[in-house]
Swiss-Prot record:
Enzyme class per UniProt: transferase
Enzyme Commission number, as recorded: 2.7.11.1
Originating species: Arabidopsis thaliana (Mouse-ear cress)
Domain Protein kinase, chain residue ranges per copy: 74-358
Binding site for ATP: 80-88, 103
Active site: 199
Keyword annotations: Acetylation, ATP-binding, Kinase, Nucleotide-binding, Phosphoprotein, Serine/threonine-protein kinase, Transferase
Recorded catalytic activity of this chain's protein: L-seryl-[protein] + ATP = O-phospho-L-seryl-[protein] + ADP + H(+); L-threonyl-[protein] + ATP = O-phospho-L-threonyl-[protein] + ADP + H(+)
List of residues that carry Phosphotyrosine: 234
Gene: ASK5
Family: Belongs to the protein kinase superfamily. CMGC Ser/Thr protein kinase family. GSK-3 subfamily.
Name of this protein: Shaggy-related protein kinase epsilon
Source lineage: Eukaryota, Viridiplantae, Streptophyta, Embryophyta, Tracheophyta
């Protein structure tokens, strides 16, 4: 069994003199930990009152393939997220000085954790990476899973709010960068791994405010969708829910993420949500006010059980009238391709990436507003490009970036 434990901050003073200790406390319920070893994961963890601000969590990882086990110590710093799932807190690795995010979720002992299984499949520059994980228990014998993730300081939600509060529009270069990277993450999880995220929203899109690299996070709702197998329809946050989910469809596809991405793009252009419904029905009303009443054929594509339902007949509102007149027409066109009633008519994530709206990102002379280089956009892996036509590849990877994809014979 790996050795685990906690130490008071004072006993590690020499290691963490530069660590900032925040006044904010973590919930007391997770401060009474017992040892829990997970044989399958070969990563153990936490003993004692380890997650109170300023306390040290000591865990042992590794030991696979004859490698020596390694002790890692984390100092809990502050809560960065809270929800029905549990909490996310920021911590500092005392050996390396690296800041991490630790997501702590209640684990049903009868099941494997789907989020953990999903995270282990993922390796992509636009997806938050899992460093390692450990289990812990409270005195009530509740089991918690702790996912140690890379820390990214901002979210697209907060960046967008910053501009809207200042009564400004987000610079279009950022809209392009964020949307491109969202679509690239989706192309990878949909095509490369077969996973549907099911909760795409600005709060789940992390962004580095210096490089503007975006990383998709929170795979707590993610699932590998299997054709013919039903799924729950009450999934995804309301403003970003695809209409087939509102109609109660259970055999939906990864195109629900595409709808959500379209909602995010529209929100970045508008400075506010496009479909701000107060309830499920109200959400549908907001969508109909923009897209018009769905045709019988479109309803059939979303949920065949509703084809006889009588909807108020409303004409579609022209897309160009929804956005500010200075909004690039390519942006409006892309929104219209992502927000289609019929799931099979929505652009795929890969089709979205090659849309002309993103041509500026493929120009070797394009820079961030501060003059810095753009974040990595073309470092594709073979897994991302499987099945892509030569025509698509030629649009996807500009000449100046071909060296990054040396495995392609372009």
């Amino acid at each position: 069994m790996a050795s685990v434990g906690t130490l008071p901050a004072s006993s590690m003073a020499t290691k963490q003199s530069n660590a900032s200790i925040c006044a904010e406390k973590l919930p007391e319920g997770i401060n009474e930990m017992k040892i829990k070893d997970d044989k399958e994961m070969e990563a153990a963890v936490v003993d004692g009152n380890g997650t109170e601000t300023g306390h040290i969590i000591v865990t042992t990882i590794g030991g696979k393939n004859g490698q020596p086990k390694q002790t890692i110590s984390y100092m809990a710093e502050r809560i960065v997220g809270q929800g029905s799932f549990g909490i996310v807190f920021q911590a500092k690795c005392l050996e390396t000085g690296e800041t991490v995010a630790i997501k702590k979720v209640l684990q049903d002992k009868r099941y494997k954790n789907r989020e953990l299984q999903t995270m282990r499949l993922l390796d992509h520059p636009n997806v938050v990476s899992l460093k390692h994980c450990f289990f812990s228990t409270t005195e009530k014998d509740e089991l918690y899973l702790n996912l140690v993730l890379e820390y990214v300081p901002e979210t697209v939600y907060r960046v967008s709010k910053h501009y809207s509060r200042a009564n400004q529009r987000m610079p279009i270069i950022y809209v392009k960068l964020y949307t491109y990277q969202i679509c690239r993450a989706l192309a990878y999880i949909h095509g490369g791994v077969g996973v549907c995220h099911r909760d795409i929203k600005p709060q789940n899109l992390l962004v580095n405010p210096h490089t503007h690299q975006v990383k998709l996070c929170d795979f707590g709702s993610a699932k590998v969708l299997v054709k013919g197998e039903p799924n729950i329809s009450y999934i995804c946050s309301r403003y970003y829910r695809a209409p087939e989910l509102i109609f109660g469809a259970t055999e939906y596809t990864t195109t629900i993420d595409i709808w959500s991405a379209g909602c995010v793009l529209a929100e970045l252009l508008l400075g506010q949500p496009l479909f701000p419904g107060e309830s499920g029905v109200d959400q549908l009303v907001e969508i109909i006010k923009v897209l018009g009443t769905p045709t019988r054929e479109e309803i059939k594509c979303m949920n065949p059980n509703y084809t006889e339902f009588k909807f108020p007949q409303i004409k579609a509102h022209p897309w160009h009238k929804i956005f500010h007149k200075r909004t690039p027409p390519e942006a409006v066109d892309l929104v219209s391709r992502l927000l289609q009633y019929s799931p099979n008519l929505r652009s795929t994530a890969m089709e979205a990436i090659v849309h002309p709206f993103f041509d500026e990102l493929r120009d070797p002379n394009t820079r961030l507003p501060n003059g810095r280089a753009l974040p990595p956009l073309f470092n594709f892996k073979p897994q991302e490009l499987k099945g892509a036509s030569l025509e698509l590849l030629s649009k996807l990877i500009p000449d100046h970036a071909r060296k990054q994809c040396s495995f392609l014979a372009l």
